[in-house]
Regions:
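Periplasmic-binding protein-like
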Residues: 157-164, 283-304
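Short beta-strand->loop
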Residues: 35-38, 119-120, 135-137, 155-179, ...
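Ligand-binding pocket segment of bilobal, Venus flytrap-like solute-binding proteins
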Residues: 174, 178-249
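A structural signal for short loop-to-beta-strand junctions that line the ligand-binding cleft
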Residues: 78-83, 101-132, 147, 159-160
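Sec/Tat signal peptide C-region and signal peptidase I cleavage site
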Residues: 22-28
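A bilobed periplasmic-binding-protein/Venus flytrap-type ligand-binding module shared by bacterial periplasmic
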Residues: 132-139, 260-273, 292-295
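An extracytoplasmic/periplasmic, membrane-proximal ligand-sensing/linker region
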Residues: 299-346
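Early extracytoplasmic/lumenal segment of secretory-pathway proteins
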Residues: 29-93
């Protein structure tokens, strides 16, 4: 699939201005080691800019799977300074596994809302992934509650990926936090009854099947729409993206915020370069770094006021569910059990 990204040149130039928030330039020999489950190419421009402005070399180690196990096995001799991953569940697992440490940063605390960081400074959100409603262009719908997915009016009209995928167990966990386990079980049964096809595939497949007339609506992540609508004209991805619009749902019992998952990072428990690790995290939430990351990946920046990709901007302002994501994550196990109990993927 061919993706057309906006020009990053202006943003790379803007990153040169970000050095003003860094403390005195570090020695050229300074370094920081980043262990990340994210593809390095997605974050390399910011890391290069950080090195240019600070003199701190970033040693990037891509760990596709088993980040927790690797760092635990390395023990006190681990060279890891910063641990970066996606999904709040994965991040909390690193904390619970004892491989992160508490830090204090006024910069991070001022940029990142309290419900999107660890109260003890053991983890921080870097970007947001809102779980939204994909809607066929010919369906009139401007607002939606997640609970409405179980309404019989949508029978045979809903598409979604596996209920056991972390994107969906996260949403189910949020439903438990808002509405309770009993109501969430009934909701899951209602959603299953409204499915137009088996819960399977990926988020892009929701858009594909809306274009194909299989379903009218579906739950998926917003950033995929940025990728699809910015794909080359004539490609399948572009056709899928052009077939849908985005509505940000809210919870009936919980204000007017949308459920989000996150990408985030933490300082490793035995970080040999703790000060440099904190500097890197602070850089990653700076305005130009956030803008570059948001425009390259179409995720919503954690820092307010950052320029968005035009497609993402067209969705309107994101108001995040006020429940702390760490509180929602506590219900992940029960969410998975409920998905199995109702046979959601069968």
């Amino acid at each position: 699939m061919s993706i057309r990204l906006p020009s990053l040149t202006p943003l790379l130039g803007a990153l040169a201005l970000a050095g003003t928030f860094l403390s005195a330039p570090a020695l050229a020999a300074d370094e920081v080691s980043l262990y990340t489950t994210r593809e390095p190419k997605l974050i390399q421009p910011m890391l290069d800019a950080f090195t240019k402005e600070s003199g701190i070399k970033v040693n990037t180690v891509f760990v596709k799977d088993g980040l927790l196990e690797r760092v635990k096995a390395e023990g006190a001799q681990s060279p890891a300074d910063v641990l970066m991953t996606v999904d709040i569940g994965n991040l909390i697992d690193l904390v619970d596994g004892g491989i992160t440490q508490a830090i204090q940063s006024d910069t991070l605390n001022s940029v990142i809302p309290a419900n999107l960081r660890g109260a003890d400074g053991k983890w921080y959100t870097l970007s947001l992934r809102d779980r939204v409603l994909y809607v066929a262009n010919d369906v009139e719908l401007d607002s939606f509650h997640y609970e409405d997915l179980a309404d019989s009016k949508w029978k045979d009209k809903v598409c979604i990926r596996s209920g056991q995928h972390p994107y969906n167990t996260g949403l189910v966990a949020a439903m438990i936090a808002h509405d309770g386990a009993e109501a969430t079980e009934q909701w899951l049964r209602g959603v299953k009854g409204n499915l137009a096809r088996k819960a399977a595939g990926g988020d892009r497949d929701v858009a594909r099947d809306i274009l194909g007339g299989i379903c009218d609506i579906g739950i998926a992540n917003a950033y995929y729409v940025g990728h699809m609508k910015n794909a080359e004209p004539g490609t399948d991805a572009r056709k899928w993206g052009d077939a849908i619009k985005v509505v940000r749902p809210t919870f009936k019992n919980g204000g007017d915020g949308t459920h989000v998952n996150i990408s985030g990072a933490a300082v490793a428990a035995h970080a040999p370069n703790k000060d440099n690790a904190i500097k890197l995290l602070e850089f990653l939430v700076s305005e130009p770094a956030q803008a570059l990351y948001a425009r390259a990946n179409y995720e919503y920046p954690i820092r307010s006021g950052v320029e968005l990709d035009p497609v993402v901007a067209s969705f309107g302002e994101l108001k995040v569910d006020s429940l702390p994501v760490a509180e929602i994550a506590k219900h992940r196990k029960q969410a998975s059990e409920l998905v199995d109990k109702v046979g959601f993927d069968n």
